[in-house]
Amino acid sequence: MKEEKRGSRFLLIISVFIIFYIILSSSFYFGFINAYIVAGALFLTLMISWIFLFRYRHTKGKFGKVSLIVLLVGILFIFDFFLLQFEQMKYRTLIHEEPVQAAGNSGIHLMSVGTAYFSHAESKEWLIKNFERGGQDFFQIEEVDNKTRYHSRNDVFLQLVGIRNDEVSVMAKNVRSYLGEETAGVEQFLESEDISGDSAGLGLALTGLIEQNKLMNNLDFGVTGALSEQGEVSGIGMIKEKLMIAEKERYPFMIIPSENAQEARQVKEAESLEIQLFAVSHIDEAVRLINRLNAEAEV
């Protein structure tokens, strides 16, 4: 009877803590509290748990149950401790990044949008003035809320424990698998530390084909799109910003994923862009397109 009562009490304590944690996490997610309060509350709970663990260190049954509670609280404390690194982020800015060619004058320009976080900016208007004063092009400035911090923490944690591979690693694996062999320009690009996301996959694979002398190109193309190992092209984010960059660079052509075609056409019409858009769902379509446009240019 006593064992059943102790077991019920243990389950009650666990249930109360889980409810407490759900309320704590929800309060953070919806912006009622900050990461310091979350970490502080869990740290205090962990210290109290350690006190009970020390108290019952010679009581076999209770020691085991309290140890489980300490372990649970400790894991959640470590998990939520990652929130602190995002707490200082106040604003996120999407900025214009110069397109790059991974290999010489391949004509394949890899499109990317820079992301910068600011922790000490006085206000959104202050940031805008400083960007304009410095002549830096930017697309938008948005305030970082707790929902963004929460999801960013989850992504970082999953990558650290190996549950989710980061997009750059997946892109590198897919490009290398598709090409079948390493090429100097592609490898140099993949080894750089300032790349993020997987939207350069299609452009890198096309660059690799040029380096392998399997594709000839004398035109300028803005290229964006994720790539699978089999050469399928999938959608990417920030298509509007990438189109605006390509237009500013005066590229005549832009190759985009078919999944982004509708949005891209809407952006082109709304912004009165002159660039010609070509949507592809497989890299083979991009290769045929490049061959055709080069042949037409020679006539």
Residue ranges with predicted function:
Residues K2-V299:
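Peripheral, non-AAA+ core regions of ATP-driven protein-machinery
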